[in-house]
Amino acid sequence: MGIVFLRNGSPYVYEAIKTVQYTPFRKWADRGEGGHYVVRRLREADRTLTSQAVKKLRQAGAKFQGKPYDSSFEWSDKRIYCSELVWKIYDRGLGIRVGELQKVRALDLSDPIVKTKMKERYGNKVLLEETVISPGEMFSSDLLVTVIQK
């Protein structure tokens, strides 16, 4: 997950992977399972995403450039995970909250794969009251529409 910005006329995905960085869109898309990817954009983007608005989004995002990836999903600015990056850029840049923040406790943690991953990351000290934004929560936001699906 990331946010697409044009750089010198070419699309790049600003994303949190090892660090927060720009990835050429094609390289990002090629990482999709079986080449699958989806691009969603704000509804009425032609009206909402003016050049001034995009400038504000870039400025909000610049504060995260180079920050390390947050594999423990803490709600802070020291380290950043993918959906947290995009959520904070929209919130801080334009005051738009794409998706509802949740507590870890509200997520479905019953899947065996999720349980194993949680145990690896947190041991027996899962921070159930930690604020999070999940990619699924953002993806399903009514504020977004699908513009590309491959």
Identify the meaning behind each predicted range.
Residues M1-K150:
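Cysteine-nucleophile amide-bond enzymes
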